[in-house]
């Protein structure tokens, strides 16, 4: 039988523990742990060699090789006057014995965490991995399992036994148990919770994340209740684009993801939030892919703005009719002067799809601008000293000031 001959070749070359021998043939059989498989293989090799020895065949070398990693064979040889010392496993150095002890260490660290799912990761000595690769290559074995996979699987299996109400999730686990077989340490990593939703800003002077100037509060501060709900150490927000702190965000709101870092509770319920300044409507839990999608989507979103504008010169309806020329315009903008200190001089090109207007008084009018995401709307109105072209002020031949800015809708 090829398995037996291959196993005999393995023990002739290397002293292997039950796990490391059994792992070479992990794909042969089902529902058998590598230790059990290795024990069974050694038992068969032992029985065959002892039988041949008693028949007078010269199998002493095979018995000695097997005895280095098999107690019954050592005892048999001792009975016929041949002493063989036990040797460490060539691959793992006997590290595979009792790896389940790390599950016990992990359970202690997991105590007090309210979680549902976990995954196991491991760090193994480089020499161990090199020796495993050497053995597999020299024996031309194609039926094996990697030692790293076995370590993770066995520890995960023991954790499931001890934590019967939890489940393994290799894609999006709440926590990751990292086992370092080099140092003998276990570290539990609490993965962040990502909550998707939409927010509306009903007031002005509200920044997204940082307080500056005359900002009254921030969206980040308003959403701190989510950090507290999940017992997190910190929280950050990932937003699809941004509006100025003095602009309202109306309509159906702007998409965002709230990231709660180092949470203690993964099963809490997410409640919506509302006060006089901000509304947050949670959609559900999400992942990093959604964060990346938000960032990309912000570049192509189409937005509808309402702008209340003050004109230095009096205007008539006929004057505003000139603005129809801006519908379908391609606008070139350099980094606005108001944020130039924060960003290098950079050119961007954005589309203005539609422009509508309403004259409120000779010096005040409303603009409705439907445009590509990323357009600096204030600069599109007043021109920013020629850094944005074309612009509304240039077309009306007057100085303009933005009094109010609202994002009405994001398509």
Curated annotation (Swiss-Prot):
Keywords: Isomerase, RNA-binding, tRNA processing. One of its GO terms (molecular function) is tRNA binding. Substrate binds at residues 305, 376. It is an enzyme of class 5 (isomerase). This is tRNA pseudouridine synthase Pus10. It comes from Pyrobaculum arsenaticum (strain DSM 13514 / JCM 11321 / PZ6). Belongs to the pseudouridine synthase Pus10 family. PANTHER family: TRNA PSEUDOURIDINE SYNTHASE PUS10.
């Amino acid at each position: 039988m090829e398995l037996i001959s291959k196993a005999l070749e393995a023990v002739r070359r290397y002293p292997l523990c039950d796990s490391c021998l059994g792992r070479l043939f992990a794909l042969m059989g089902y529902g058998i742990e590598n230790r059990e498989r290795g024990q069974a293989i050694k038992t068969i090799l032992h029985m065959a060699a002892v039988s041949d020895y008693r028949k007078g065949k010269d199998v002493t070398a095979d018995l000695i090789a097997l005895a280095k990693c098999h107690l019954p064979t050592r005892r048999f040889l001792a009975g016929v006057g041949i002493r063989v010392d036990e040797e460490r496993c060539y691959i793992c150095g006997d590290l595979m014995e009792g790896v389940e002890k790390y599950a016990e260490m992990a359970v202690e660290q997991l105590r007090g965490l309210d979680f549902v799912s976990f995954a196991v990761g491991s760090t193994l000595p480089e020499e161990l991995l090199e020796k495993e690769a050497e053995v597999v290559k020299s024996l031309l074995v194609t039926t094996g399992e990697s030692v790293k996979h076995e370590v993770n699987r066995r520890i995960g299996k023991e954790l499931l036994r001890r934590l019967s109400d939890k489940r393994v999730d290799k894609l999006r686990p709440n926590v990751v148990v990292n086992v370092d077989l080099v140092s003998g340490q276990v570290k539990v990593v609490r993965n962040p919770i990502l909550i998707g939703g939409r927010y509306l800003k009903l007031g002005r002077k509200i920044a997204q994340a940082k307080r500056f100037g005359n900002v009254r509060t921030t969206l980040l501060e308003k959403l701190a209740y989510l950090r507290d709900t999940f017992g997190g150490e910190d929280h950050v927000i990932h937003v699809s684009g941004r509006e100025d702190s003095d602009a309202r965000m109306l309509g159906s709101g702007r998409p965002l993801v709230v990231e709660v870092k180092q949470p203690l509770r993964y099963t809490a319920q997410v409640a919506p939030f509302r006060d006089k300044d901000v509304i947050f409507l949670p959609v559900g839990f999400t992942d990093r892919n959604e964060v990346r999608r938000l960032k990309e989507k912000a570049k192509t979103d189409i937005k509808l703005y309402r702008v209340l504008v003050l004109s230095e010169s009096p205007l008539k309806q006929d004057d505003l009719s000139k603005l129809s020329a801006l519908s379908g315009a391609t606008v070139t903008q350099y980094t606005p002067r108001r944020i130039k200190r924060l960003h290098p001089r950079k050119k961007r090109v954005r589309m203005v799809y539609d422009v509508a207007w309403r004259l409120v008084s000779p010096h005040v009018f409303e603009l409705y601008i439907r445009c590509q995401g990323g357009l600096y709307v204030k600069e599109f109105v007043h021109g920013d000293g020629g850094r944005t072209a074309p612009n509304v002020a240039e077309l009306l031949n007057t100085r303009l000031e933005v009094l109010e800015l609202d994002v009405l809708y994001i398509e």
